[in-house]
Amino acid sequence: MRRLVIKVMAAQAMGLVENPWSDEFTVVTYDRRGNSRSPRPSGWETTSVVEQADDAAALLTALALAPAAVFGNSYGGITALDLLIRHPGVVSRAVLHEPILVSVLENPGEVQAVVGSVVEAGMAAGGPQEAVEHFIRFAAGDDNWDRLDPDLRHRMASNGETLFNVEMGTFESYRPDDATLAGITTPTQVLVSQESADFFDEAAAWLAARLAVEVVQTPGTHTPQWDQPEELVRTIRPFLRGPS
């Protein structure tokens, strides 16, 4: 029996390599609301983690795929976390890789200022599409951006309007309370990459402590699905398999 994994990814984290999964898992991906091939709804000017999680739950339910294992990266990590909290019935187990929990950091303003300066420089250089490139080079590294397929780079850059004008600035305040996190019973793994910025480690440690799990490290950057796909799958495969 093949296991099902759904990937909940941030707009800047698409393009997860499928081959390392294909021997054992059926992998489902989707374009989040207003990104890539998912049309932007009329009048849609803001979003929330709750809306994003509701979308993912509705997809799994409509396709009769629940419960499924969930892998969430970056903004997708907090979407997956909200699935665990409000839609536990659609998730069999979850891997949360570097969820963007800015509000739990000791100095969230410093992190937001750094990211803001990167985005502002990109906007000044060429608007939202150029800002996407600046942002991904900052988050994932120059090598990762440079080796992406040109068509994928273009598609990701085209999401700049949604990323910067709808999503960014709305997700960063997301912070479930301790009691809510302690009530999660679905098996969950918290993951960080070895080459990522320290604030990802800080947020992961905060979350793992409240879920009563250990932080697991994987090689690579904020986007290990690009630079270390086989190592990423090797790291999380035993957990995704679950009990025999």
Region spans (language model):
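Catalytic active-site module of serine/aspartate enzymes centered on a nucleophile-bearing elbow/loop
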Residues: 210-244
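Conserved hydrolase catalytic core segment
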Residues: 66-108
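Helix-rich cap/lid subdomain of alpha/beta-hydrolase
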Residues: 99-154, 168-170
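Conserved HGGG/HGGXW glycine-rich cap/lid loop of the alpha/beta-hydrolase fold
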Residues: 1-40, 45, 59, 238
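Short beta-to-alpha linker loops that shape the active-site pocket of alpha/beta-hydrolase fold enzymes
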Residues: 31-35, 100, 219-221
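Conserved catalytic-core motifs of eukaryotic protein kinase domains, centered on the activation segment
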Residues: 38-44, 106-107, 201-202
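Conserved serine/cysteine hydrolase catalytic core
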Residues: 155-211, 216-220
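Conserved acidic catalytic loop of the alpha/beta-hydrolase fold
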Residues: 50-68
